[in-house]
Regions:
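Glycine-rich phosphate-binding/hydrolytic loop that grips phosphoryl groups
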Residues: 78-107
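Short, low-complexity, intrinsically disordered N-terminal peptides in bacterial proteins
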Residues: 121-123
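Surface "functional belts" at beta-alpha junctions
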Residues: 1-82, 109, 114, 119
């Protein structure tokens, strides 16, 4: 299993990759986020050089392996989290008192919606 500095990757469509840069500390069951970004595949591959990458998407994993092995990118195909996994993680956070008040939550919109991108300009 991946540990230390890990990039989590999801196919974002349009030739882009959602990339989360995390520090995994399995001995304390903690994860620290460094960044979450939307990158072109080229930017992602450059950023992933020498790092571990995890993804639940087989096609993305194969694409990264095909071009990333020479760059020292290690890819691990992981299971896609299901609702039971999400519930367990949420429960663990609640038990540790790691909660956020609803008014303190911040939405993380990484890119504009298709409607915003493809809408006709106002006249």
């Amino acid at each position: 299993a991946a540990r230390g500095r890990v990039l989590a990757a999801l196919d974002a469509g349009r030739g882009d990759v959602y990339a989360g840069d995390y520090e995994l500390e399995p001995h304390v069951r903690r994860c620290r986020m460094h960044s979450e970004r939307l990158l072109s595949r080229e930017e992602f591959l450059a950023d992933a050089r020498g790092k571990a990458v995890v993804t639940p998407e087989a096609v993305l994993a194969e694409t990264i392996r095909a071009v990333g092995t020479a760059a020292g990118i290690r890819v691990e195909l992981i299971d896609c989290p299901n609702s039971g996994t999400i519930a367990r993680l949420g429960w663990e956070h609640l038990q540790r008192g790691q909660t956020v008040r609803p008014e303190e939550l911040e939405a993380n919109y990484i890119r504009h919606s298709d409607a915003e991108i493809f809408s006709k300009p106002a006249v």
